[in-house]
Amino acid sequence: MVYVGAPSKSHSANNYFSHGMAFGGGGVTLSFPLTAALARTLDVCIERYPRLYGSDDRLHACITELGVPLSREYGFHQWDIRGNAHGILAAHPIAPFISIHHVEFVDPIYPGLNSLESLELFTKAMKTEPMSFLQRSVCYDKKQKLTLDISLGYVVQVYPSVLLPPELERSERTYIAFKRMSQRTEFDFDTKEIQKSMCKKPVLFFLKDVWKDGNITRGSYIRSSERDDLKRKVFCFRSPPLSDIDEIQVSASPLSKRWHLAPRRLCSAVKGYVNDTLFMFVRQCGRGAFGSAFDSLD
């Protein structure tokens, strides 16, 4: 018997309901044997829990009676957040993306688009290559001392310094919790403060379009219109990273059908420049590859 899902992103919500409950908005998956057992016991079971709120709460109680724990799947997302979801989307866990809930409370996902247009592009990217959608890849430009952090189907972040993967894994708190709290302890996952220093902030390239080219998925990421090149040059004593680049084109090869059984962050490399466009390639790490930091910096 298997009970699959994920708790809320909000620590308060998990404390109130349960850290071991699959929240219904993010999605719940039950194995056939568990479903069959519930079919025999559910009607009587829910009578014992009249004070519980919501079908997911009652379902969790009855599954607990059967002695089945939650198998947490990190691709289910009961967001329970408000504001700018950038920090979560840019730092998706290494797991297949499955669902999100409460998108009505967050800002449009992509700059320059309204909420509906953003969700249409988001869905297009997801359907074009579901397995690798929002998967991360980190590589480095050793000569310019840059970090390129890709979240497929969403954004490419170019940092003006070398940042190692453990720091990049943490989600930047660009959002607040559903109950409008923003402190670190309110979130049930690893977070970090918003980078306030202009000289350390990344330059962002957001997805503009995505398409298939044979079995390769290609995405066009356009430089954010919020440019502060002059300020960076004056106050940081250097030009912003990739100041001559307006577009990054990312080509991604398909993942194996068994990737999710032993997931690993993807590998990537810069392929070259043509005029104002940077070309990158993302793929599943091959045998003997030790990761971007080892391969690029040592």
Segments predicted by a language model, with ranges:
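Amphipathic alpha-helical interaction motifs in eukaryotic regulatory proteins
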Residues: G5, T35-R40, H60-T64, H101
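A short, conserved acidic/glycine-rich loop-to-beta-strand motif
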Residues: V2-K9
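C-terminal catalytic/acceptor-binding lobe
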Residues: R51, D57, C62-D298
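Alpha-helix capping and helix-loop boundary segments enriched in small/acidic/polar residues
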Residues: M21-G26, E47-G54
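Short coil/turn segments at secondary-structure boundaries
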Residues: M1, Y16-G20, R40-D43, G75-F76, ...
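Conserved nucleotide-sugar donor-binding
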Residues: F23-L42
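GT-A fold catalytic core of metal-dependent nucleotide-sugar glycosyltransferases
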Residues: M1-V2, E47-L52, P69
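A recurrent flexible, glycine/aromatic-enriched loop bordering the glycosyltransferase active site
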Residues: N15-T29, H92-I94
